[in-house]
Amino acid sequence: MGGKYKLKEVTYSLGPDSWEVMRGLWKGAGYKTHKRIHENWVSALTLLVPVIGSYWYAENYREKEKLHHRH
Amino acid sequence: MARRLSILKQPIFSTFNNHLIDYPTPSNISYWWGFGSLAGLCLVIQILTGVFLAMHYTPHVDLAFLSVEHIMRDVKGGWLLRYMHANGASMFFIVVYLHFFRGLYYGSYASPRELVWCLGVVILLLMIVTAFIGYVLPWGQMSFWGATVITSLASAIPVVGDTIVTWLWGGFSVDNATLNRFFSLHYLLPFIIAGASILHLAALHQYGSNNPLGINSSVDKIAFYPYIYVKDLVGWVAFAIFFSIFVFYAPNVLGHPDNYIPANPMSTPAHIVPEWYFLPVYAILRSIPNKLGGVAAIGLVFVSLLALPFINTSYVRSSSFRPIHQKFFWLLVADCLLLGWIGCQPVEAPYVTIGQIASVGFFFYFAITPILGKCEARLIKNSNACEARSVLASFLTSIGLLWW
């Protein structure tokens, strides 16, 4: 079981709602979102471009095929 | 911690306590780490609903389809059991795929957790077999023809192929013997998955969980209960909502309408499509025009997954600190999505070409893994920007050569 670790002391006290930690959930939401986008936009592109690009290519190809057979 | 119930110190309970209550967990693990326990929940749902469905199901070619209808119409709560079981399989795969990609992103397969990863791949394989034979049981058109197509793949194996197919079928076609052995195996395999999951957990708990930073977290551990338990619970509630939407509002959206037609060996459906969770592998199979080549490619998918911890050369685990790997990871995700999409398209242009490129792309990720780790190690070593650029150039050249 991962050896013997000294676990951090746990204090059983009030529930999370009483600690008012939820109030901090939206704190700096704008900054956090901006930071996320700024740091990950290249990764997002590497995910989206091949998927959307391939789908667009396939649709375009099929449309051209259809028109080719029509005329 | 100071006050602990004495019952938890007793032999059986102490094991339970050590692994599920006082288990030391890294304090920084995120919600992505909740998919492991969620997969366990899915397995429990599948076993429980499956056991109750088996009480009303009849594994006979003349009665199987009707017995499913009987479950849906006559058995009290039968519709719920069946929809939970059918959609539960899809949910199980969604959870396991997310669990898998989390492991891949954060390098959870890297030393010393190779065994955890390999056992995970074995569980995935068992899941695929279980789900496949489970889909045959309703004895609809897609059940019958899916079974015929997939079991026939074994005939591609030289010399013994045809014998294997006859042995799988229990005769000379997919028939009553096939349905009976599939039912028997479908009941057995989930318990083997449960056993493998316990081994997976035992192997994990030997070295402890990985964390988003991918570093040794021995100095910063917290007890599983209540901290991680509460975190997992958030995931369970979110999952319950997501699962309920499918079960109560769109129970057939993930299935195929042809499976509501009784199996007819004299009428082949226009498109034989497997369940959505098999589509990426199915796309790889179809991308190779040779039958044996396709089967070998499927084998290679699982060999690649099993080999991943051993071909990995990176000293850094988490992709948060591996910017180049991070891009390849997202390309792999895109590639798998593309393969999934291609798997349900007809075999015609341009889908064939896209499928073939995506199949190459899938294996390309595993081919560059050893090179990537070494290149990143050099980049870290050489902080000089100019040298870093030259290493990057040599890396890109090697990728180009490999691709060529």
From Swiss-Prot, chain B:
Record-given protein name: Cytochrome b
Organism: Marchantia polymorpha (Common liverwort)
Cell location: Mitochondrion inner membrane
Superkingdom of the organism of origin: Eukaryota
More about this protein: Heme 1 (or BL or b562) is low-potential and absorbs at about 562 nm, and heme 2 (or BH or b566) is high-potential and absorbs at about 566 nm.
Entries under CDD domains matching the protein: cytochrome_b_C, Cytochrome_b_N
UniProt cross-references to InterPro entries, sorted A to Z: Cyt_b/b6_C (IPR005798), Cyt_b/b6_C_sf (IPR036150), Cyt_b/b6_N (IPR005797), Cytb/b6-like_sf (IPR027387), Cytochrome_b (IPR030689), Cytochrome_b_C_euk/bac (IPR048260), Cytochrome_b_N_euk/bac (IPR048259), Di-haem_cyt_TM (IPR016174)
Membrane topology classification: Multi-pass membrane protein
Co-factor(s): heme b
Assembly notes: The main subunits of complex b-c1 are: cytochrome b, cytochrome c1 and the Rieske protein.
